[in-house]
UniProtKB/Swiss-Prot annotation:
GO molecular function annotation: proton-transporting ATP synthase activity, rotational mechanism
Assembly description: F-type ATPases have 2 components, F(1) - the catalytic core - and F(0) - the membrane proton channel. F(1) has five subunits: alpha(3), beta(3), gamma(1), delta(1), epsilon(1). CF(0) has four main subunits: a(1), b(1), b'(1) and c(10-14). The alpha and beta chains form an alternating ring which encloses part of the gamma chain. F(1) is attached to F(0) by a central stalk formed by the gamma and epsilon chains, while a peripheral stalk is formed by the delta, b and b' chains.
Organism field: Prochlorococcus marinus (strain MIT 9211)
Protein name according to UniProt: ATP synthase subunit delta
Highest taxon listed in the record's lineage: Bacteria
InterPro entries named in the record: ATP_synth_OSCP/delta_N_sf, ATPase_OSCP/d_CS, ATPase_OSCP/dsu
Location in the cell: Cellular thylakoid membrane
Topological category with respect to the lipid bilayer: Peripheral membrane protein
Gene3D superfamilies, alphabetized: N-terminal domain of the delta subunit of the F1F0-ATP synthase
Function: F(1)F(0) ATP synthase produces ATP from ADP in the presence of a proton or sodium gradient. F-type ATPases consist of two structural domains, F(1) containing the extramembraneous catalytic core and F(0) containing the membrane proton channel, linked together by a central stalk and a peripheral stalk. During catalysis, ATP synthesis in the catalytic domain of F(1) is coupled via a rotary mechanism of the central stalk subunits to proton translocation.
Length: 182
């Protein structure tokens, strides 16, 4: 996605610099994660912000109404700037890039854990400890997802490493082995 990075990186870098200058980095990062979740869950928001029919001022007013008091003023201004520059449709990509830059700056590895059922705190703690050894760092961020199609177990992704300890993965591997035999 080099083209997308040429759009998202300058905005993400600039916003990270603003957050650092205002000493709001941790707050901005937490808000970015929340907004990304909202963006993923709300097709109406994505469609409205990405719509070429909706006027820029209407988009800015909608952002103000939705996010005022829920995000820092600098975050709201950032989103309005994206709307003004016809880039609000890329909000998720810009925020993803922001998180990547933040993690890179602080040497934080991202581990995506997909489980068949939600993990309780004890399971998360145990998994975090094991994933830290696989990742080779204690500075780790867990991104938890649930996918009932896994049937049981979990799949962990850290960079290019994948650990598939899911029941569906075991069934798939067993099927491949059986196919080799026949």
């Amino acid at each position: 996605m080099p083209l997308l990075n040429t759009i998202t990186t300058p905005y993400a870098e600039a916003f990270l610099q603003v957050a650092e200058s205002k000493k709001e980095v941790e707050k901005i990062i937490a808000q970015a994660k929340s907004i990304l979740q909202l963006w993923d869950e709300s097709s109406e928001l994505r469609e409205a912000m990405g719509s070429p029919v909706l006027e820029v001022e209407s988009k800015k007013a909608a952002l103000e109404k939705i996010f005022s008091g829920k995000v820092t003023p600098s975050f709201l201004n950032f989103m309005k700037l994206l709307a003004e520059r016809q880039r609000i449709g890329f909000l998720n990509s810009v925020l993803e890039r922001l998180l990547e830059l933040y993690r890179a700056q602080r040497n934080i590895a991202l581990a995506t854990v997909t489980s068949a059922t939600p993990l309780n705190e004890d399971q998360q703690a145990a998994l975090l400890k094991n994933v830290q050894s696989v990742a080779g760092t204690n500075n780790l961020e867990l991104n938890l997802k649930v996918d009932p199609d896994l049937i049981g177990g979990f799949v962990v992704r850290v960079g290019s490493k994948v650990i598939d300890a899911s029941l569906s993965g075991q069934v798939r591997r067993m099927g491949l082995e059986l196919a080799k035999v026949t």
